[in-house]
Amino acid sequence: DDRIYMALSAGWQTAEASPIRPTVQDEHHHVGFYLANPLYRVVPALYESLAEALQSVYGVAVRLPKLLGFATWVGGDMDGNPNVGADTIAASLTSQRMQVIEHYQADVAALARLLSQTESRVAVAPELQRRLADYRERMPQAAASIRPRHADMPYRCLLTLIGARLALTQDQQTDGYASSQDLLDDLQLIADSLLQHHGVHAGAYSVERLLCRVRSFGFHLARLDVRQDSRVHDDALAALLGDADWASRDGAERAERLRPYASGEARFPDSDDDSATSLQAVFTTLRDSRQSHGVDATGLYIISMARSAADVLAVLALARYGGLIKGDSVPLNIAPLFETVD
C-alpha cells in the first residue's frame, strides 16, 4: 500500500527526538493530542465491548456506570521544574476544558444534522418539549438562528440550542452549563425520548456514544494532578514560622507545631518569601479552579520525598494559607510518596 510505504519512508527520514528540550506547553500539546483524539474516539467502543461481553456471558443487558477517567500531571508537576507553577496549572486546566468542549460542540452539531425527526411523523417526550421551550426563552438570539424549515424538528432544535449553550460555557458566561452533569441531563433527555418513541435505530446509538464521552471526560478532559517536593514545603514553612532549622527538626515535633495551622485554629502571617508566595499562588489557583472548572478538574496533590505525617500536615496548612478551604476542611486529595534518593 502506497500510504504505508510513504509513512514508513517519512518515519525513517525523521530524527527520533528533537535536540531542543520540550517546554511545558510542548508536553501539554503532546498529551492533549492523545486524550482529545484517539482516546476520545475509542472510549465508547470500550464500553460497548464490555457491555457485549457481559451480556454474552451472563445473558443480561446492563447499563454500565462510569468506569473510566483520565489524569495527567503535565502542567502540574512542579517537582524539580521551576517552569511549572500556578500559571501552568491554570493554563493546562483552561486548555483541557477548551479542547473537550470543542469536541462536544462538534459532536452535538453532528447529532443535530442526524436527528431530523419531525413532529408530524413521530412524537417526542413532553419533558423534551418543555426543555426546548425553556431554552428558546433563555437564549432568544440562538433560537432565532434556527432555520424556519427546521422549526418542527424538536431534536435538531434542542441540539442547536445545546450547542449554543456550550459556546456560552466555553466563554464562561452566565447562561452556560454550570457543570458537565447539566449537559448529561440534556443529552439523557434526548436519549430517553428516542428510546420511548421508536428511535432505537434512528439516532439513539449516537446519542449514547456522546453520553459515554461526557461521563468519561466531563468539562475537564483529564484530572490535573499536582506534585511538589516536601523540601519545597519545608522552605516555605521555615519562612512562615520564622524557623531557619525547620527542615532538620524531628517529624513528631514538626507535626505538633503544624496541627493548629492544618486545622485552621491558627493562621500564618503574610510573607514576601518567594517559596511561600509561590506555593500560596498554587493553592489559590487550585481553589479558583474548583469554581471555574469544577471539582473534578483537579486530582491528587502528590508529595514527593515525604517522610512522615508532618509532610501531609504541611500541605494542609499551606493549602489553608492559599485559601483552599471548603467549609471547615481542605478539599484536597493528598498522596504522600514515602521515598528517598538512596
Task: Annotate each PLM feature.
Residues 53-79, 198-211:
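Short acidic, Pro/Gly- and aromatic-enriched capping/linker segments at domain boundaries
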Residues 16, 24, 61, 76, ...:
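Conserved alpha/beta-domain cores
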Residues 23, 50, 71-74, 78-82, ...:
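A nucleotide- and high-energy phosphate-metabolite-utilizing enzyme signature
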Residues 1-15, 114-292:
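Extended, charge-enriched "interface" segments that sit outside catalytic cores
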Residues 48, 79-86, 92-94, 222-225, ...:
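Short helix/loop capping segments that flank catalytic or ligand/cofactor-binding pockets
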Residues 84-115, 322-342:
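Catalytic or ion-translocation cores adjacent to nucleophile or general acid/base/metal-coordination motifs
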Residues 24-69:
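Extended, Lys/Arg-enriched charged tracts that mediate electrostatic binding to polyanionic substrates
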